[in-house]
Amino acid sequence: MKSKLKLHGFNNLTKTLSFNIYDICYAETPQDQQAYVEYINQEYNAERLTQILTEVVEIIGANILNIASQNYEPQGASVTILISEEPVTPTESQIEESPGPLPEIILAHLDKSHITVHTYPEIHPDAGIATFRVDIDVSTCGVISPLKALNFLIHQFDSDIVTVDYRVRGFTRDVEGNKHFIDHEINSIQNYLSEDTRDAYQMTDVNVYQENLFHTKMLLKNFELDNYLFGDATSNLSSEQRAQVTERVKHEMLEIFYARNMPS
């Protein structure tokens, strides 16, 4: 087993894991499209997102300092959680009746990190394609690794397409004064995914190792049209219409996966 790196002072590395998760569906009528947006707003409102992120904090072994959440009109929600590596237990000096510290002796909180989530429901009014995007950022300073939250977050949402970015920034020093720009081995984000997740998705990597920058795109392999239908479309489509919708939904997924418009 590798011996632990002995650091001089605090681990100043910042590790950031960013997700873009997409859920795709087909809603045929304007009424169904509006119902889909309302469903998403209810299913992934600020309260539910707060519960999910609170579990993420537990998974990565951090402690919650503060939570800010907001539901938006007409749609969408956001949650931001400020976290810390250290347990949030007030010291006697923090709760006793005494003057606070002077400005010149206040220390910067270098171990503070954060988790944010934003939701973006969107509908194509003509084609009937509805997309729900979730943006999640898990940024940690110190020894906590946001990669521990990878599998949990993918399974918490109906993830048809996922783009994941992981980067390490800053440096920390060992006791001999040498800089270390990363404190763990990694050659692919895929190595942090469970076997069932790797089997379920087609994945592509774009990694810039010398910049400690890692990128993985994921597209769900198994396509069952019934999983993508919402409202009347679940029962009212003819065989020909189902074939057309299948082509339309798959085309939408490929455009999002490759991040470019593609010919129909």
UniProtKB/Swiss-Prot annotation:
Cofactors: pyruvate
Post-translational modification comment from the UniProt entry: Is synthesized initially as an inactive proenzyme. Formation of the active enzyme involves a self-maturation process in which the active site pyruvoyl group is generated from an internal serine residue via an autocatalytic post-translational modification. Two non-identical subunits are generated from the proenzyme in this reaction, and the pyruvate is formed at the N-terminus of the alpha chain, which is derived from the carboxyl end of the proenzyme.
Pfam families per record: AdoMet_dc
Free-text comment on the cofactor: Binds 1 pyruvoyl group covalently per subunit.
Membrane-traversing stretches: none
Gene3D superfamilies the record matches: S-adenosylmethionine decarboxylase
Active site, UniProt feature: S113 (schiff-base intermediate with substrate), H118 (proton acceptor), C141 (proton donor)
Superkingdom assignment: Bacteria
Example GO BP: spermidine biosynthetic process
Modification Pyruvic acid (Ser), positions: S113
Pathway stated in the Swiss-Prot or TrEMBL entry: Amine and polyamine biosynthesis; S-adenosylmethioninamine biosynthesis; S-adenosylmethioninamine from S-adenosyl-L-methionine: step 1/1
Annotated EC: 4.1.1.50
Cellular component terms (Gene Ontology): cytosol
Record-marked site positions (Cleavage (non-hydrolytic)): K112, S113
A molecular-function term among this protein's GO annotations: adenosylmethionine decarboxylase activity
NCBIfam families: SAM_DCase_Eco
Function, as annotated: Catalyzes the decarboxylation of S-adenosylmethionine to S-adenosylmethioninamine (dcAdoMet), the propylamine donor required for the synthesis of the polyamines spermine and spermidine from the diamine putrescine.
Family matches, as PANTHER family: S-ADENOSYLMETHIONINE DECARBOXYLASE PROENZYME
Subunit structure: Heterooctamer of four alpha and four beta chains arranged as a tetramer of alpha/beta heterodimers.
Protein name: S-adenosylmethionine decarboxylase proenzyme
Species of origin: Pseudomonas fluorescens (strain Pf0-1)
Gene: speD
